[in-house]
A protein has these predicted regions:
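Generic low-complexity, intrinsically disordered sequence content enriched
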Residues: 8, 18-21, 125
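Acidic-basic catalytic patches of nuclease active cores, encompassing PD-(D/E)XK
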Residues: 15-56
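Glycine- and acidic
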Residues: 10-15, 86-87
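Acidic metal-coordinating catalytic centers involved in nucleic-acid phosphodiester chemistry
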Residues: 2, 6, 66-69, 75-155
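Active-site metal-binding core of divalent-cation-utilizing nuclease and nuclease-like domains
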Residues: 46-78
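Nuclease-adjacent, charged terminal/linker segments that flank catalytic cores
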Residues: 1-11, 23, 46
Length: 155
């Protein structure tokens, strides 16, 4: 089973994730990804078109890097893919400054994987996000979007 770490501590129970704020929603998604290998595989396949071994995936929640912000989620298997997810509540998309900071984070830059992506998650449809996200690619890293509706469909 994948490992879920929040604030440096392993999350072992869904009850650690109760709440309805933006961060609570993100924690719940992270927990579901870590505990449901088929859901994790479906999400990775959706955004990267990759078949993965869920056993080898690490999911990090609220990962801090000095001068580069705090990511909502970072998901990697350290061999084929590295994803940074920025989740928003409502019809909101991450801005250019936030995406630029994430594209410069040490972990994604130094990762030897061949598939990297920054993913926006919100209630915005994919069509809306494709029209209004500030970048399609930043620092050679593709920027994509998954709506909460699509996440629900994948689950």
């Amino acid at each position: 089973m994948s490992e879920l770490v929040a604030y440096g501590t392993e999350v072992s129970s869904v009850f650690q994730l109760i709440g309805n704020l933006e961060n609570d929603i993100t924690k719940s998604i992270a927990w579901a990804l870590a505990r449901c290998p088929e859901f994790l595989k479906a999400v990775i396949n959706e955004v990267m078109s990759l078949e993965i071994d869920a056993q080898n995936v690490r999911i990090k929640y609220q990962e801090f890097e000095k001068n580069k912000g705090i990511t909502d989620l970072e998901i990697t298997d350290d061999t084929s893919f590295y994803i940074i997810i920025e989740a928003k509540r409502g019809w909101i998309l991450p801005g250019a400054e936030q995406l630029a900071l994430y594209s410069q984070r040490r972990n994604i830059i130094e990762s030897p994987v061949s598939h990297k992506s920054i993913i926006s998650m919100s209630e915005c449809s994919e069509d809306y996000a494709n029209a209004y996200l500030p970048f399609k690619v930043i620092n050679d890293i593709p920027v994509n979007h998954l709506s909460w509706k699509r996440i629900y469909e994948l689950a």
